[in-house]
Amino acid sequence: MPELALLEEVVEKVRPLLGQGKVADYIPALASVDAGKLGIAVTTVDGETLGAGDYLEPFSIQSISKVFSLTLALTLYEEAEIWSRVGKEPSGHSFNSLVQVELERGKPRNPFINAGALVIADLLQSRLGAPKHRMLELVRQLSQNDKVCFDKQVADSEYQHSARNAAIAYLMKSFGNFQGDVDTVLRTYFHYCALKMNCADLSKAMLYLANRGKSITGTELISQVQTRQLNALLATSGLYDGAGEFAYRVGMPGKSGVGGGIIAVIPGELSICVWSPELDGNGNSLAGTAMLEHLSQRLGRSIF
């Protein structure tokens, strides 16, 4: 376990970067977040959690939820059913691109861009009677926090600005790769993105990625092989168009969200969550990436 002093050092090291990024403003409910927040939490495979900075302040997890939705799909479907509808390759296009969906005849490149996550939400919608409730159950169980909830204001705000995601869903539907009612699936998808959690919650919830598929309670969520495969996808596609840069600087599987959170994993050791709302040009937390880079260097850890 890293010492508390190291986590505090990491937070202070990146503080001068504040003001260099830009808070997501295309979702009005996210635009009002205090840009000066910085938090980090780590959870070890022994179940111990440590944090520094604003690590107990809840934020909108946004695309980090795509890890939970894919994990949930892996518990409900045969893998062939999932991967026949969504690929495993980095996209090279923006996360909300329509161009690639058109060129590749409705099959998204990976489950972590919007098109891929919408297919996963479609799969969950068709197999679960109450997909929103099931997701809430899962993240509460994984984080050991019954207070985790959806931020209805954020979900509604995203739904009111959902033209592009609706266009992606209808385009995939035209190719036969979207089964459900678009409006219903979009509402489920936006609720997932609007989950509100803090760094401690997320570092605990993602521990299964560091612990061979076993959650903080020791329950097996997915198999050891599936965990390794999921980490591989996170390493290649978890950071939008910044995945290569992140692999170079941080060297860990990770997933970001436009709420400013990033989760990262050192397999066999610990899971990490950082948060700083200001984003870089790829939509990844600017100071958050720097915190992970500094931590990785100080711990001497990388999967490469």
UniProtKB/Swiss-Prot annotation:
Highest rank taxon of the organism: Bacteria
GO biological process, one term: glutamine catabolic process
GO terms, molecular function: glutaminase activity
Pfam families assigned to the protein according to its UniProt record, in alphabetical order: Glutaminase (PF04960)
Residue positions binding substrate: 63, 114, 158, 165, 189, 240, 258
SUPFAM superfamilies: beta-lactamase/transpeptidase-like
Keywords: Hydrolase
Reaction catalyzed: L-glutamine + H2O = L-glutamate + NH4(+)
UniProt KW Cytoplasm keyword: no
Record EC number: 3.5.1.2
InterPro entries: Beta-lactam/transpept-like, Glutaminase
Primary enzyme class: hydrolase
Subunit structure: Homotetramer.
Family that this chain belongs to: Belongs to the glutaminase family.
HAMAP family in the cross-refs: Glutaminase (MF_00313)
Name this polypeptide is given: Glutaminase
Protein's organism: Shewanella baltica (strain OS185)
Gene encoding the protein: glsA
